[in-house]
Amino acid sequence: MEVMNLIEQPIKVTEWQQTYTYDSGIHSGANTCVPSVSSKGLMEEDEACGRQYTLKKTTTYTQAVPQSQGDLEYQMSTTARAKRVREAMCPGVTGEDSSLLLATQVEGQTTNLQRLAEPSQLLKSAIVHLINYQDDAELATRALPELTKLLNDEDPVVVTKAAMIVNQLSKKEASRRALMGSPQLVAAVVRTMQNTSDLDTARCTTSILHNLSHHREGLLAIFKSGGIPALVRMLSSPVESVLFYAITTLHNLLLYQEGAKMAVRLADGLQKMVPLLNKNNPKFLAITTDCLQLLAYGNQESKLIILANGGPQALVQIMRNYSYEKLLWTTSRVLKVLSVCPSNKPAIVEAGGMQALGKHLTSNSPRLVQNCLWTLRNLSDVATKQEGLESVLKILVNQLSVDDVNVLTCATGTLSNLTCNNSKNKTLVTQNSGVEALIHAILRAGDKDDITEPAVCALRHLTSRHPEAEMAQNSVRLNYGIPAIVKLLNQPNQWPLVKATIGLIRNLALCPANHAPLQEASVIPRLVQLLVKAHQDAQRHVAAGTQQPYTDGVRMEEIVEGCTGALHILARDPMNRMEIFRLNTIPLFVQLLYSSVENIQRVAAGVLCELAQDKEAADAIDAEGASSPLMELLHSRNEGTATYAAAVLFRISEDKNPDYRKRVSVELTNSLFKHDPAAWEAAQSMIPINEPYADDMDATYRPMYSSDVPLDPLEMHMDMDGDYPMDTYSDGLRPPYPAADHMLA
């Protein structure tokens, strides 16, 4: 009956809502005009606390439900209890003369008496707050059952008024704790929010859940009551405040409530969130983007849903059009997570992601710069043909001068990928002192292979196949890089780094001016040592009949090919030829002619071609029985291999009898030179054959994926992001660090 009376008198409900802080009106039913708390005492209390409140008298009505004398006595005792406690503990708060606490006042100054009284005033204020806190909690606890019934009422007006009251209660900590301790009330709020078509009710109910979500108990209550699907539904609301409350509540759930991420995914939350990226409120977008990052991190299906709903394009637009740092940071975190997804990467690049991210590399926000660097690093393997990256490349070269390990790792990796098979980018980096900057980065990196390896790869790209390649080759020498580079051949450096270094040395040897410094750095003995070790390892597997395994992503046959190719170029110098010959390498080179790998046959024939220019070496080649395999190689499908073989045969047959020379000549004519006079001339005159090696094509980083990476701390309840672990290396572009994502710590 009491609830029915409240429904029949909306004006009374309104007045109750306005004055609920002091008397809910549900349990007392007192037919009285007495204020719930003495207005004079409360005003004095407010002055002591330095605060002001709007005071109203509370009138409750009991026309339909007469109240017993016992209920009235209970209400009077409850109302007076707080006042008695205040009077007992803080007489100055409720007395008539509290305003005269300090009569002596010098205008604009604090007297000594006032300063002495400050601690007691602070204590009095704390006690008053404690009493009020207890009052709020008791009030909310008494009101909960009745409020739950009102929220479940069939009359939408009653439901709206009840939602308003609960919303007010949820704004105070004590009453808020009472609310989230009632599963029935939270469930009623969720049910009301899900079923209402009234905008005010939707606003109040989402506000209630938003307030509760600031406590772990509240998050659990929302989660258990099925609040996540209801909140996802509210993301379609046309009311901005409802959208804000819904997205912030979901954000808190995603951050702190176990199981929330899966629940949001199952409720199609991603499909609702991605379109919200078209809103224009930066703070709203910052929370929305962080929700996307939390859902996409470590979950490939979520990344694909974001892609299917146009997420990459919208995120790139945000990076391009906004300047709010927190939004740019959260957006860059989403892009960083998506940048390890093979499907999302091309979409981000095609939307102009490289250029948009590059805009922020000079930002004053270190966390934004680092996220942009990681994302660029991860995208760079699919952006080798992108135009308009001139400013990005210049900034990356400048970034090589910093000492931050993450910055150096990203800058070197990105430069390595963007200079892969891109002559324009190679020339630009070379002309902007990129070679010098990379050498200095290598010198500072020490044993950090994740910096040294991509830096060496970038140098390898810059020293071949573009108009400024010779300039780059000379620049390495002029910046004292050769000794440091040769040292990288030492074990126990990782094989990927060793392989990249071998390729760089081969390119440096193309410049005659580099031969002497390379020799002084003892590069030839180191290359021969690596060649012997790699060949022995490869032969062991051949003898055992097992497949050649990868060591850190590198096959030993690749090391054999690289070392032999570098020695081939170095052997063009007479002093180097003599040193290679004296290291007793000819038996090994002859053995390599029998290799089943075509590229190894070619480089072995090439180095023998150079060595055979010296008679002593030519005799040694002949003595090792090289004629037979060389005759076979005359029929090779690789023209370079056949030409090298012919040149060696001509050289070693010079001292043979005429019959032998004639037989060799006939064989060469029939097999190789019948339709190629130029090759005949080349073989006879020992002109070096300069066809490109297999590794002349720039080798970039291969995809390296690892597990989820740590993320940067988010200051507005956003505590996650992605960082990137170490990856392995091999030839090929280096895509992202993780195949899962990054968490930023």
Swiss-Prot record:
The gene is Jup. Residues 132-297 are annotated as: Interaction with DSC1 and DSG1. It is found in: Cell junction, Adherens junction; Cell junction, Desmosome; Cytoplasm, Cytoskeleton; Cell membrane. Glycans are attached at T14. Keywords: Acetylation, Cell adhesion, Cell junction, Cell membrane, Cytoplasm, Cytoskeleton, Glycoprotein, Membrane, Nucleus, Phosphoprotein, Repeat. Belongs to the beta-catenin family. This is Junction plakoglobin. GO terms for biological process: canonical Wnt signaling pathway; cell-cell adhesion; positive regulation of transcription by RNA polymerase II. It is a peripheral membrane protein. ARM repeats lie at residues 132-171, 172-215, 216-255, 258-297, 298-341, 342-381, 383-420, 423-464, 470-510, 512-551, 574-613, 615-661. It comes from Sus scrofa. It holds the Pfam family Arm. The modification N-acetylmethionine is found at M1. Residues 574-661 are annotated as: Interaction with DSC1. SMART domains: ARM. The lineage of its organism: Eukaryota, Metazoa, Chordata, Craniata, Vertebrata. Its main location: other.
